[in-house]
């Protein structure tokens, strides 16, 4: 959520920034929220005058009573003032609700570093690592490799649940578990993150806090009778871990890593990478989340992105890093990098991680603040997160980039200790 004071003081700048985003956004709501804000401040000024008058009148009552004078008129005046204040308070509550409704639907403002552009075609490659894998034979897609090795079963998952679900079997299940363990060990032992095992269901307030609601409710799996949501990413519970709290400045940055299953309806994605492991309704992911001081956040974003890159380098998977343009930025991020791995069957790079700085956008929604010391005024933290990285897509990338002509798959060296020393799946 944006700072209302920032909108008040820089409305034209805010409108221009919102107009430059890819999705269509009706900037007239900025004028609407400013009109409501002005109305609210005018009423607050009137309420302050009435309260001051009521206090003044009230202070006269004991003296007049002591002098034996009739105070009935003053008591009546106090009652009228209280009723008038009560009416204004009711009006203020309605105005606050309208302002909140609008503010929750205004996207974040892109950081000046974000490049211009309308679609993912306009994203800018920052760097890459390793050349795309070359084969002397026709490489197979990971869904065919996994099916032939009897380690992935899409057909039976379709029978048991539906499309875009998968059974991992035998060494496939072990490979998935190995990747999870390797990622968690790397981020905790080498990069200094504290591990969190979060709930897989959250309440509506949590989804609002990280920006999934109200905009993306159609993409969420909801348990209607309890108003719970299956998490689309561990970012939601881990960020909300500190909702409505004031952190200590000397604790920042706080760094958490969390493994979780993730659940997404992927509404509107029909026909886009829907075969195999790339776009599933349920998938596993290791998430990196940081809480920082504002002046630290962009340095910490670079570190977080490098942490996510490390596991791809150690796995030996070709990848590139792209800076996301304004039109492809999404609702909550101020600046975002995507890590994309090379997928031979697609003959292109496929996103495996998004690393974002939300600045204070989520912190305002979730009311997460910090204080430098006991006497300092609380300030909003900056929140960051990135996949460290998606598990299913990592498995897919391993199967495709490490395949052999005979259909076997070489296991990356860093995963072999987690696979009982096994070197090949065949």
UniProtKB/Swiss-Prot annotation:
Keywords in alphabetical order: Aminoacyl-tRNA synthetase, ATP-binding, Cytoplasm, Ligase, Nucleotide-binding, Protein biosynthesis
Major localization class: cytoplasm
Entry's EC annotation: 6.1.1.11
Compartmental location: Cytoplasm
Binding site residues for L-serine: 233-235, 287, 387
InterPro entries xrefs: aa-tRNA-synt_IIb, aa-tRNA-synth_II, aa-tRNA-synth_II/BPL/LPL, Ser-tRNA-ligase_type_1, Ser-tRNA-synth_1_N, SerRS_1_N_sf, SerRS_core, tRNA-bd_arm
Domain notes: Consists of two distinct domains, a catalytic core and a N-terminal extension that is involved in tRNA binding.
Subunit structure: Homodimer. The tRNA molecule binds across the dimer.
The keyword NADP is annotated on this UniProt entry: no
PANTHER family, alphabetized: SERINE--TRNA LIGASE, SERYL-TRNA SYNTHETASE
Name of the protein in question: Serine--tRNA ligase
Catalytic reactions of this protein: tRNA(Ser) + L-serine + ATP = L-seryl-tRNA(Ser) + AMP + diphosphate + H(+); tRNA(Sec) + L-serine + ATP = L-seryl-tRNA(Sec) + AMP + diphosphate + H(+)
BP GO annotations: selenocysteine biosynthetic process; seryl-tRNA aminoacylation
